[in-house]
Amino acid sequence: MERITVTLGERSYPITIAAGLFNEPASFLPLKSGDQVMLVTNETLAPLYLDKVRGVLERAGVNVDSVILPDGEQYKSLTVLDTVFTALLKKPHGRDTTLVALGGGVIGDLTGFAAASYQRGVRFIQVPTTLLSQVDSSVGGKTAVNHPLGKNMIGAFYQPASVVVDLDCLKTLPARELASGLAEVIKYGIILDADFFTWLEGNLDALLRLDGPAMAYCIRRCCELKAEVVAADEREAGLRALLNLGHTFGHAIEAEMGYGNWLHGEAVAAGIVMAARASERLGQFSSTDTQRIIALLERAGLPVNGPCEMSAQDYLPHMLRDKKVLAGELRLVLPLAIGKSEVRGGVSHEVVLSAIADCQQA
């Protein structure tokens, strides 16, 4: 069992990583006998895990209710968020309740925002079931729902009480979802850790076949990197923005193509290559390193080009709504070398459009 702490003073919390955690009541810190819980999951995961998690909590004396939501990025919305509030109010659940997010990034983000909002804030626990949510979205307290005009535009910074990563969940993950998570894994190597990127080049095949020790190390390293960044810059005033490599381009793809048609990691993968091409055009990044990135993404089964249905011009309206925009100026996360990156303002639209055009599908 691995345990990492996200250090935020009185709001610090553990990330527990191991196989078989759903069998252990002690995994679900800080729940105790007599607590009230609302389990939030989706229609795909409920048959797989809901009864198992409910059972282990009830055997520990926890009072458990549940709400099952539709599955998909398109349901990460205010309308579906209201379903959670209604379920909480009907029981009813008070300020001493705990929401448990049992699912991937959509469930985690939506449940976290529900917890931040319900009766001005209640406790919640992240139980991520996808690789993407285990290495990224469950850690750090970013919670949100989407708006038709932009991804994650309505939300709050709100930290969980704990994160429970059961490696066994990856056994039921579709191959496309596994690849989507690997985009975020590869991102960490590009922006923060050249040695980890090199390790990924040598161990990607092991990750694709869900090798236990390799996957445990991979998730632990990603969580360590994320925890260090969040501890230093919880509200994304500087360093934390680096975690958005590829996301400004990727969010444009998700919004333009319709949420759910491109998985988040797929869009981020294409966006990472666009960011690398932009950095190349600015003389900040080598074409050799871009090719290393492309090769690793392709081995992971990820796209390295944007959708053929989008022109370069289609990206800009979405990118100009990005949360990093200041005074109407685009700010992009750009790689400088494998393991090093920066947030750069003043990147011209010409450079951005050229980088996108370099990465458009024929």
UniProtKB/Swiss-Prot annotation:
**Pfam families listed in its UniProt record:** DHQ_synthase, DHQS_C
Enzyme Commission code(s) on record: 4.2.3.4
What keywords appear on the UniProt entry? Amino-acid biosynthesis, Aromatic amino acid biosynthesis, Cobalt, Cytoplasm, Lyase, Metal-binding, NAD, Nucleotide-binding, Zinc
Query: Where does the record place it?
Result: Cytoplasm
Q: Does the keyword Zinc apply?
A: yes
- Please state which protein family the record places this protein in: Belongs to the sugar phosphate cyclases superfamily. Dehydroquinate synthase family.
| Name of the featured protein | 3-dehydroquinate synthase
Origin organism is Salmonella enteritidis PT4 (strain P125109)
